[in-house]
Amino acid sequence: MNGDHMVLGSSVTDKKAIILVTILLLLRLVAIAGNGFITAALGVEWVLRRMLLPCDKLLVSLGASHFCLQSVVMGKTIYVFLYPMAFPYNPVLQFLAFQWDFLNAATLWFSTWLSVFYCVKIATFTHPVFFWLKHKLSGWLPWMIFSYVGLSSFTTILFFIGNHRMYQNYLKNHLQPWNVTGNSIRSYCEKFYLFPLKMITWTMPTAVFFICMILLITSLGRHMKKALLTTSGFREPSVQAHIKALLALLSFAMLFISYFLSLVFSAAGIFPPLDFKFWVWESVIYLCAAVHPIILLFSNCRLRAVLKSRRSSRCGTP
């Protein structure tokens, strides 16, 4: 899903790998279309009504970052296959990497803030801190967005410095992409600079996400356990709302976890890029990315309303 460090100079000729690459591209298109629809639907409502629920603001921001991220990865994939012998840190790939680093960090932080918002608003803990956060969190939304912009920009600049230094070293020593000395310098920089920076950048939002997810699942479990003791049980509207939220959160968590693992595996070089196992893993990741927008479409009331209005307009009903 990341497309961060594809090692160029090798080609995929195996028929199975070619099929997986084709499936991967189709899944990317589905993910782009799904996130594009979410962004357009909520974005238009935001512009027309001049207001939107804080949760939906985070959702449209996440959809927009996902949409742009998928587009950048698609562009990088096309460039890699058109120019397989290009140096991984040439100006074109540096430009694409700059966009990818920013959008990747933005996606992680938007996902994290959305999980924080779900946890605070849906969880039924009686601790005074939760009651205080319920009243304050909505007003903090602009600062949450500004903080993600600042953190994403800062880490993107650090990544760009490392990438640019490797390219300058490549030009200075007239190294070839397959040169042993050049590869050793790249490996040293990637191992002792880029990899630790990536782990710090990616682990911070992931840790917050997991804490919020555990708290929310614990709260929902307690609430549904109490509901079983009532006469209405799972037919209680509040319980059904919690179940829908839990399903949406679980799909969200699966996508987040798979995305985080893909970043770590790619940075650690566990799956050799352009290898068959690499494409199998990428296909699984993008399957989650393609399914998640569909789940959001049916779990979000505003998005469901947009779908119903589109259906009614196509059928010619008022």
Swiss-Prot record:
Q: Which keywords label this protein?
A: G-protein coupled receptor, Glycoprotein, Membrane, Receptor, Sensory transduction, Taste, Transducer, Transmembrane, Transmembrane helix
Topology within the bilayer: Multi-pass membrane protein
Please give the start and end residues of each transmembrane region. 8-28, 41-61, 89-109, 129-149, 184-204, 235-255, 265-285
Cytoplasmic compartment residues: 29-40, 110-128, 205-234, 286-318
SUPFAM superfamilies registered for this protein in UniProt: Family A G protein-coupled receptor-like
**Annotated GO CC locations:** plasma membrane
Q: Which cysteines are joined by disulfide bonds?
A: none
Q: Which residues lie on this side of the membrane: Extracellular?
A: 1-7, 62-88, 150-183, 256-264
The entry's family comment says: Belongs to the G-protein coupled receptor T2R family.
Describe the function of this protein: Receptor that may play a role in the perception of bitterness and is gustducin-linked. May play a role in sensing the chemical composition of the gastrointestinal content. The activity of this receptor may stimulate alpha gustducin, mediate PLC-beta-2 activation and lead to the gating of TRPM5.
Name recorded for this polypeptide:
Taste receptor type 2 member 60
Q: What is the lineage of its organism?
A: Eukaryota, Metazoa, Chordata, Craniata, Vertebrata
